[in-house]
Amino acid sequence: MTPPRKLHIKSYGCQMNVYDAQRMVDTLAPEGFVETASAEDADLVILNTCHIREKASEKVYSELGRLRVAKDEAARGGRAMQIAVAGCVAQAEGEEIVRRAPVVDVVVGPQSYHHLPELLKRAGNEGRAVETEFPAADKFGFLAQPKPDAIRARGISAFVTVQEGCDKFCTFCVVPYTRGAEVSRPVARIVDDVKRLADNGVRELTLIGQNVNAYHGDGPDGKSWPLGRLLEHLAGIPGIARLRYSTSHPRDVDDSLIAAHRDLAALMPFVHLPVQSGSDRILAAMNRKHTADDYRRVIDRFRAARQDIAFSSDFIVGFPGESEQDFLATLALVTQIGYAAAYSFKYSARPGTPAADMQETVSPAEMDQRLERLQELIDSQQSAFNKAAIGSTVDVLFERPARKDGQIVGRTAFLQPAHVMASPGIIGQILPVRIDSLERYSFLGELVTPRVAREPALSPIATGA
């Protein structure tokens, strides 16, 4: 029997890359590859890359420098190691990667992962293989499906890609160039994936896409289904207790999505809705095609539909031309909305984007100062949101043993980690927990009732409407 070959994948960036990494593992399993935690011991190392920020892509080249040493060590020991660069850096830079890092054997863009087996063979025969085209075929129809044991090993939460690409062309963003135009998967294929996951123990699904609420997939009735209708359908699949989605664009929030948050108890009341800036002038320069007040109105619609809903967001400071007044408008928006969590970044010019050619730049020192001020406000809001839960009882979906002996960790509806002393038998169950204290970002608490599974109702949530 041929011994299995070892595969190590390191993913950078977004949730889509986590999903893509799992699908690459599934695609390579029939070729005899099994995952290993060590890059040094691997026969194949894949760097699944992100191109959103300059530091992310530079990390890849730093990692390739370390892998060159590991590859040389393997060769001295008589073992061949292949190195592949996948993801958005691969798509954006293509042949430049092998010129800059000759240690790389394969460069493969996000739309071509189903070609990995043949690309590895080609690299073995020809020395290099680069594929970064946008093929017309839907890659999702060709990627291997995970086996039941692989699904169970990955735990009770899973990502499912329903949409890929973006048509918005924000001036700072490379996604339309690296992931292509918006494409939605057919409803039937998504349902098949979800049923397979549910049959093998998955309780929580996060539907993902670069612009997930732009989803309009072909439904079984011959009509185009929006995200809200898809969520409603998936909520009825036995075994699925929680639904989430990410990442959203304010312009694509429609009535069906608002209704889903009003009506579906399985749909968690936590929405990641990036806005990037609170200044209309900067939003226009970013080509966001909405104003700060447009964003506020979207938030109001969600809150009218479900009172306990909470939000996270993304913000960029130091976008070209951002004045102190523009930045103060961002602080005002954050103060007014009140976030459970948010992510702030200094502007990073990406080659090939319109913003990279904008001349009126903000100094690094000013960016640092604004980032610190914004993050201080965000941190204070997150701390207040978390502390408000102390003393209350919340439902927690338990996921795995914690690092501390005897503890099991799960997550609340708002993705806050919660630790309790309990047996592993509660993993996969949703149970009420009294929150006793907060340590940094994690709760400590106690189970309130006997350890019996509680399923969230799929009936409409009572509202004042």
UniProtKB/Swiss-Prot annotation:
<feature type="binding site">
    <location>
        <position position="50"/>
    </location>
    <ligand>
        <name>[4Fe-4S] cluster 1</name>
    </ligand>
</feature>
<feature type="domain" description="MTTase N-terminal">
    <location>
        <begin position="5"/>
        <end position="125"/>
    </location>
</feature>
<feature type="binding site">
    <location>
        <position position="170"/>
    </location>
    <ligand>
        <name>[4Fe-4S] cluster 2</name>
    </ligand>
</feature>
<keyword id="KW-0411">Iron-sulfur</keyword>
<protein>
    <recommendedName>
        <fullName>tRNA-2-methylthio-N(6)-dimethylallyladenosine synthase</fullName>
        <ecNumber>2.8.4.3</ecNumber>
    </recommendedName>
</protein>
<feature type="binding site">
    <location>
        <position position="173"/>
    </location>
    <ligand>
        <name>[4Fe-4S] cluster 2</name>
    </ligand>
</feature>
<feature type="binding site">
    <location>
        <position position="166"/>
    </location>
    <ligand>
        <name>[4Fe-4S] cluster 2</name>
    </ligand>
</feature>
<dbReference type="InterPro" id="IPR005839">
    <property type="entry name" value="Methylthiotransferase"/>
</dbReference>
<dbReference type="InterPro" id="IPR023404">
    <property type="entry name" value="rSAM_horseshoe"/>
</dbReference>
<dbReference type="GO" id="GO:0051539">
    <property type="term" value="F:4 iron, 4 sulfur cluster binding"/>
</dbReference>
<keyword id="KW-0408">Iron</keyword>
<comment type="similarity">
    <text>Belongs to the methylthiotransferase family. MiaB subfamily.</text>
</comment>
<keyword id="KW-0004">4Fe-4S</keyword>
<dbReference type="InterPro" id="IPR006638">
    <property type="entry name" value="Elp3/MiaA/NifB-like_rSAM"/>
</dbReference>
<dbReference type="Pfam" id="PF00919">
    <property type="entry name" value="UPF0004"/>
</dbReference>
<feature type="binding site">
    <location>
        <position position="14"/>
    </location>
    <ligand>
        <name>[4Fe-4S] cluster 1</name>
    </ligand>
</feature>
<keyword id="KW-0479">Metal-binding</keyword>
<keyword id="KW-0949">S-adenosyl-L-methionine</keyword>
<dbReference type="InterPro" id="IPR007197">
    <property type="entry name" value="rSAM"/>
</dbReference>
<dbReference type="GO" id="GO:0046872">
    <property type="term" value="F:metal ion binding"/>
</dbReference>
<feature type="binding site">
    <location>
        <position position="88"/>
    </location>
    <ligand>
        <name>[4Fe-4S] cluster 1</name>
    </ligand>
</feature>
<comment type="subunit">
    <text>Monomer.</text>
</comment>
<comment type="function">
    <text>Catalyzes the methylthiolation of N6-(dimethylallyl)adenosine (i(6)A), leading to the formation of 2-methylthio-N6-(dimethylallyl)adenosine (ms(2)i(6)A) at position 37 in tRNAs that read codons beginning with uridine.</text>
</comment>
<dbReference type="Pfam" id="PF01938">
    <property type="entry name" value="TRAM"/>
</dbReference>
<keyword id="KW-0963">Cytoplasm</keyword>
<dbReference type="Pfam" id="PF04055">
    <property type="entry name" value="Radical_SAM"/>
</dbReference>
<feature type="domain" description="Radical SAM core">
    <location>
        <begin position="152"/>
        <end position="384"/>
    </location>
</feature>
<dbReference type="GO" id="GO:0035600">
    <property type="term" value="P:tRNA methylthiolation"/>
</dbReference>
<dbReference type="InterPro" id="IPR006463">
    <property type="entry name" value="MiaB_methiolase"/>
</dbReference>
<dbReference type="InterPro" id="IPR013848">
    <property type="entry name" value="Methylthiotransferase_N"/>
</dbReference>
<dbReference type="GO" id="GO:0005829">
    <property type="term" value="C:cytosol"/>
</dbReference>
<keyword id="KW-0808">Transferase</keyword>
<dbReference type="InterPro" id="IPR020612">
    <property type="entry name" value="Methylthiotransferase_CS"/>
</dbReference>
<keyword id="KW-0819">tRNA processing</keyword>
<dbReference type="InterPro" id="IPR002792">
    <property type="entry name" value="TRAM_dom"/>
</dbReference>
<feature type="domain" description="TRAM">
    <location>
        <begin position="387"/>
        <end position="449"/>
    </location>
</feature>
<dbReference type="GO" id="GO:0035597">
    <property type="term" value="F:N6-isopentenyladenosine methylthiotransferase activity"/>
</dbReference>
<dbReference type="InterPro" id="IPR038135">
    <property type="entry name" value="Methylthiotransferase_N_sf"/>
</dbReference>
